[in-house]
A protein has these predicted regions:
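Active-site neighborhood of glycoside hydrolase catalytic domains
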Residues: 132-207, 212-214, 223-224
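Conserved beta-strand edge residues that scaffold enzyme active sites
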Residues: 93-94, 116, 192-194
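Conserved small/polar residues in nucleotide/adenosyl-binding loops
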Residues: 227-234
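Beta-strand-loop-alpha-helix segment that lines the small-molecule cofactor/substrate pocket
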Residues: 108-116, 228
């Protein structure tokens, strides 16, 4: 089994042949594990695991934001030294090297796709969402779904739509797309609008991701119809 303390991996070789001629070949690492989200918490291989994580941006300080495998590895080593067992890739998909390392080093990952949907936060960067969101979901799922470290997909982070009932359908559309491409994983989103847990937005998610206000968790857990609540951000 793939576990946090013993992240055992297998290698699968896929070969495409045309007659006797090999025309393509690919090696894929994968791990065997089960993931469950219950009202009592998160379970890996049937055992309850408390997620102790960070929101990990893709920059590497003075090394820059380009993928640097040893830089990522050192980051994860430091995180593990002070007890981290999970990472949320804020606020965009990680470099493939990050997931390879998390597979190898036993780190759980919430794989986040968007920071902006249809509504812009800064007046820019939202022009292509309607045209590209489906393809982006498909590409992310197809790229990352074989990684045992990935335990959930995150469709967004603090999007303005969480407070607009007439736009909640966008969240439902994204959740449905993730389920279509990968029915084995839950979908979450980082929410910073306190009312989003009650106004119906949370019902479009499998796991409600709460940003800050930890004092309100118990009250919201009693008030809403869904059972999965997770702290996405609690401090900066």
């Amino acid at each position: 089994l793939w576990t946090l303390n013993a992240p055992h991996l297998y290698k699968m070789k896929t070969t495409v042949r045309m007659g006797d001629k090999v025309i393509d070949q690919k090696f894929t690492n994968f791990g065997v594990r089960t993931v469950e989200w219950k009202p009592t918490g998160f379970y890996l291989n049937g055992e309850r695991v408390q997620l102790k994580g960070v929101c990990q941006h893709h920059d590497l300080g003075p090394l820059g934001s380009a993928a640097h495998t040893r830089g990522y590895e050192r980051q994860i080593e430091i995180l593990k030294e002070f007890g981290v067992n999970s990472i949320r890739t804020s606020h965009n998909p990680p470099a493939p090297e990050v997931l390879d390392l998390c597979d190898k080093m036993g780190i759980l990952v919430i794989d986040e796709l968007f920071d902006i949907w249809q509504c812009s936060k800064e007046g820019v960067n939202n022009e292509s969402f309607n045209e590209w969101h489906e393809r982006d979901v498909v590409n992310l799922c197809h790229r990352d779904r074989n990684h045992p470290c990935v335990i959930a997909w995150s469709s967004g982070n603090e999007v303005p739509e969480q407070g607009m009932k007439n736009l909640h359908h966008i969240s439902q559309t994204l959740t449905d797309l993730f389920h279509r491409e990968d029915p084995t994983r839950k979908v979450t989103s980082g929410c910073n609008n306190a009312n989003a847990a009650r106004n119906g937005f949370g019902d479009t998610l499998d796991v409600y991701g709460y940003n800050y206000k930890p004092w309100a968790y118990k009250d919201f857990a009693k008030a809403v119809s869904y059972t999965h609540l997770r702290a996405h951000e609690t401090s900066q």
